[in-house]
Amino acid sequence: MPRRPLLEFEKPLVELEQQIEQIRQLARDSEVDVSQQLQQLESLAARRRQEIFQGLTPAQKIQVARHPQRPSTLDFIQMFCDDWVELHGDRRGNDDQALIGGVGRVGNRAVMLIGHQKGRDTKENVARNFGMAAPGGYRKAMRLMDHADRFRLPILTFIDTPGAYAGLEAEEQGQGEAIAVNLREMFRLRVPVIATVIGEGGSGGALGIGVADRLLMFEHSVYTVASPEACASILWRDAAKAPDAAAALRITGRDLLELGVVDEVLEEPSGGNNWAPLEAGENLRAAIERHLEQLLSLSEQQLREARYSKFRAMGRFLEKTSQDVDKAA
């Protein structure tokens, strides 16, 4: 069994992991019964891992959200979706690999599935542009959503991107316009939309497929208006202050649940989704089916009105009165 890469704050587990691997190797090479010792060490490692992950800072949660072995959109689709058929192209000559989609079946219900897709290694990440979609990707996503709306297919989106691609070519092709159209049109959809932040949800790149009736989020995922590194560079001219920015941005599931941005935070297996992806997939499937059943009981008008009201209720506008100005003076 290959060792999983450990994050910096998981280093206290290194010695335990090495001992576990040594005992497994001993069991493979001899007939010695080491099952009891192995079970004890694995239980100890699980307890320590749980203790570590219960006290993660926002900056550490970002590391978990970006873990290279964290389940991706395609991983989740393969876990709980039957008869998956990927659909390609935006009908303008582009087929962005950073944003994928297609039709599948969850249980007995046909659905449209759309999500950001990162790579597992450098070569695949380059091919998928590290999950940063170009305008063609968002136009492809909107084409698939229109298709779902026409055939009354519920839409499931999976958010996992550091942000929309901000290169010169993307700007020339209308990146801002493509995302803006998606925001407008998603409010008009007549079918249920459930979005899940499975990794990192960055800025407009996440919002481009994130206007949903229900927004779910894994507990070690993050959802933010800008990456902490970018925020620190803008505010303090120092990317090293990213941990401070991460805390100030309130990017965690608990914070966003309190703010009314997300509707449910899904628990992750001890150590994060990368340690037990199948368990994570079952948790996500159960949550999606539960919310989908609730949304399908609403009429088209109720669905759209509730979606609009949900986003209108987010945030507050604070304006100083003349009395406040006088007091400050």
Curated annotation (Swiss-Prot):
Catalytic activity field: N(6)-carboxybiotinyl-L-lysyl-[protein] + acetyl-CoA = N(6)-biotinyl-L-lysyl-[protein] + malonyl-CoA
Cellular component, GO annotation: acetyl-CoA carboxylase complex
Disulfide bonds: none
Keywords linked to the UniProt accession: ATP-binding, Cytoplasm, Fatty acid biosynthesis, Fatty acid metabolism, Lipid biosynthesis, Lipid metabolism, Nucleotide-binding, Transferase
Taxonomy, superkingdom: Bacteria
InterPro entries in the record: Acetyl_CoA_COase_a_su, ClpP/crotonase-like_dom_sf, COA_CT_C
PROSITE patterns: COA_CT_CTER
Domain CoA carboxyltransferase C-terminal: 40-294
This protein's pathway: Lipid metabolism; malonyl-CoA biosynthesis; malonyl-CoA from acetyl-CoA: step 1/1
Location of the protein in the cell: Cytoplasm
Broad class of the protein's primary localization: cytoplasm
GO molecular function: acetyl-CoA carboxylase activity; ATP binding; carboxyl- or carbamoyltransferase activity
GO biological process: fatty acid biosynthetic process; malonyl-CoA biosynthetic process
Keyword Oxidoreductase: no
Subunit structure: Acetyl-CoA carboxylase is a heterohexamer composed of biotin carboxyl carrier protein (AccB), biotin carboxylase (AccC) and two subunits each of ACCase subunit alpha (AccA) and ACCase subunit beta (AccD).
Purpose of the protein: Component of the acetyl coenzyme A carboxylase (ACC) complex. First, biotin carboxylase catalyzes the carboxylation of biotin on its carrier protein (BCCP) and then the CO(2) group is transferred by the carboxyltransferase to acetyl-CoA to form malonyl-CoA.
Similarity annotation: Belongs to the AccA family.
Protein name: Acetyl-coenzyme A carboxylase carboxyl transferase subunit alpha
Organism: Synechococcus sp. (strain CC9605)
Lineage of producing organism: Bacteria, Bacillati, Cyanobacteriota, Cyanophyceae, Synechococcales
Gene field: accA
